[in-house]
């Protein structure tokens, strides 16, 4: 019952935050839509900001699963790394990710938690280590390189999400990403 209540609040909040935005979402309307009380919201999440943090964490987890699946199904380590980077930028145009994670989440919650950043960096570092071991890219500290790549992808995703029309920025970012990634390849 407790998990069902939590899941219902998260699902209702995701819909409301995506369509209405965090600031315009009324907690009374949200809990009424979920068929629950404000007390249930406060019990599970503390407040509206806590609910947003839980929604962002849930979406981040789903993004990570999608990126891991892309890496796992790629033909080779280079395609895994490249596909993961490209997909991350493309996800910045998805309405739910764009509004909840990249716009409202950043504005209300601030930068991503250190734990979330470390998870992304560790995944990228593992891919980069495989590329170095396979002599596909030149040797460097994989964690330092992962931080640089993660930082550029994250900042580019915010830039894409903040655009009034995301298509030109996405295409520009993907083109720039290809240039950056080609620069990593061993000559």
How should each PLM-predicted stretch be described?
Residues 91-111, 158:
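Amphipathic alpha-helical segments used for helix-helix packing
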Residues 1-20, 24-36, 49-53, 58-61:
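Basic, helix-initiating cap at the start of DNA-binding domains
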Residues 61-64, 109-136, 143-147, 171:
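Amphipathic alpha-helical packing segments from all-alpha helical-bundle domains
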Residues 5, 48, 55, 59, ...:
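Hydrophobic/aromatic residues within well-ordered alpha-helical segments
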Residues 87-90, 121-133, 152, 158-187:
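C-terminal peripheral helix-coil segments that are non-catalytic and often amphipathic
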Residues 39:
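Key DNA-contact positions within bacterial/archaeal DNA-binding proteins
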């Amino acid at each position: 019952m407790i998990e069902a209540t939590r899941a219902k609040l998260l699902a209702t909040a995701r819909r409301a935050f995506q369509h209405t935005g965090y600031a315009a979402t009324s907690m009374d309307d949200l809990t009424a839509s979920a068929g629950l009380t404000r007390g249930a919201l406060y019990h599970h999440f503390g407040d509206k900001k806590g609910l947003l943090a839980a929604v962002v964490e849930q979406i981040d987890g789903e993004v990570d699963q999608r990126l891991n699946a892309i890496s796992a199904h790629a033909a080779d380590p280079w395609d895994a790394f490249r596909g993961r980077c490209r997909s991350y930028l493309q996800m910045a145009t998805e309405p739910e990710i764009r509004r909840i994670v990249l716009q409202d989440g950043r504005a209300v919650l601030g930068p991503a938690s250190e734990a979330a950043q470390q998870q992304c960096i560790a995944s990228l570092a593992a891919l980069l280590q495989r590329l170095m071991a396979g002599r596909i890219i030149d040797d460097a500290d994989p964690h330092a390189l992962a931080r640089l790549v993660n930082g550029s992808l994250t900042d580019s995703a915010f830039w894409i999400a903040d655009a009034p029309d995301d298509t030109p920025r996405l295409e520009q970012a993907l083109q720039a990403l290809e240039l950056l990634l080609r620069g990593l390849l061993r000559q």
